[in-house]
């Protein structure tokens, strides 16, 4: 039995093994103490067993945490996919500043930025509007404005973050309002815009 008791001791550090060895010699006659030292030897041998358990628990928690994160990322990706789709839809509907529409959602923090990038797009048709007959030039802009209204409606229905497009449409209407001939058409439209916005 001595070697049997020796084996668990070896698994401990050599110092404690030495210590136990000494004890075992001492307590050769005392059986209860011997069994006690045996339990002592086995209890450190068991203590590593519970210790792998908490790690496995933490691993499980980590897995759950990772899964949650993955789900969150998937949700974010879905939202990101939805937004460009809608803005692309609006871009396809509004003929002139389509490039700007596509670029602006990529940097939502710079909301004033898209408006700046849209201004030149709106100023560009203005010279052509003055050279050509104004009614013809006014017609496309008004249709574009009404299309923007429809796009706004869709955006409101589809995505909660509707603040991406609304700042643009008033910017468009105000921008083209700079031209007096168009003022009539666009004033009515911009007021409708405001109704939609409110």
From Swiss-Prot:
Q: Which stretches are tagged as biased composition: Basic residues?
A: 17-31
Where the protein is mainly located, per its record? nucleus
Q: Which family does the record claim for this protein?
A: Belongs to the hunchback C2H2-type zinc-finger protein family.
This chain's protein is named: Protein hunchback
Q: Which UniProt keywords apply?
A: Developmental protein, DNA-binding, Gap protein, Metal-binding, Nucleus, Repeat, Zinc, Zinc-finger
Q: Where is the composition biased (Basic and acidic residues)?
A: 179-198
**What's one GO BP annotation on this UniProt entry?**
segmentation
Give the compositionally biased regions (Low complexity).
35-46, 68-83
Native organism is: Drosophila cyrtoloma (Fruit fly)
Q: Residue ranges under compositional bias (Polar residues)? A: 95-105
**Subcellular localization:** Nucleus
Describe its function.
Gap class segmentation protein that controls development of head structures.
Q: Which domain of life is it from?
A: Eukaryota
Recorded GO molecular functions are: DNA binding; zinc ion binding
User: Mind giving the lineage of the organism this protein is from?
Assistant: Eukaryota, Metazoa, Ecdysozoa, Arthropoda, Hexapoda
Provide the Gene Ontology terms for cellular component. Answer: nucleus
User: Region annotation Disordered: residue ranges?
Assistant: 16-116, 158-198
């Amino acid at each position: 039995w001595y070697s049997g008791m020796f084996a668990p001791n070896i698994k401990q550090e050599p110092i404690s093994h030495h210590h136990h060895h000494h004890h075992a010699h001492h307590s050769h006659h005392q059986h209860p103490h011997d069994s006690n030292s045996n339990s002592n030897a086995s209890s450190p041998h068991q203590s590593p067993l519970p210790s792998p358990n908490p790690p496995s628990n933490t691993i499980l928690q980590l897995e759950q945490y990772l899964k949650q994160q993955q789900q969150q990322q998937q949700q974010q990706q879905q939202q990101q996919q939805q937004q460009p789709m809608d803005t692309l839809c609006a871009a396809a509907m509004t003929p002139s500043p389509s490039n700007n529409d596509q670029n602006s959602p990529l940097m939502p923090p710079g909301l004033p930025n898209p408006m700046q990038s849209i201004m030149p797009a709106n100023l560009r048709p203005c010279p052509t509007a003055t050279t050509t007959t104004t009614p013809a030039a006014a017609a496309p802009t008004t249709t574009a404005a009404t299309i923007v209204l429809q796009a706004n409606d869709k955006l409101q229905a589809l995505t909660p973050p509707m603040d991406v497009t609304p700042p643009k449409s008033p910017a468009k209407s105000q921008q083209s309002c700079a031209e007096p001939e168009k003022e009539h058409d666009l004033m009515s439209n911009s007021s409708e815009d405001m109704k939609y916005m409110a």
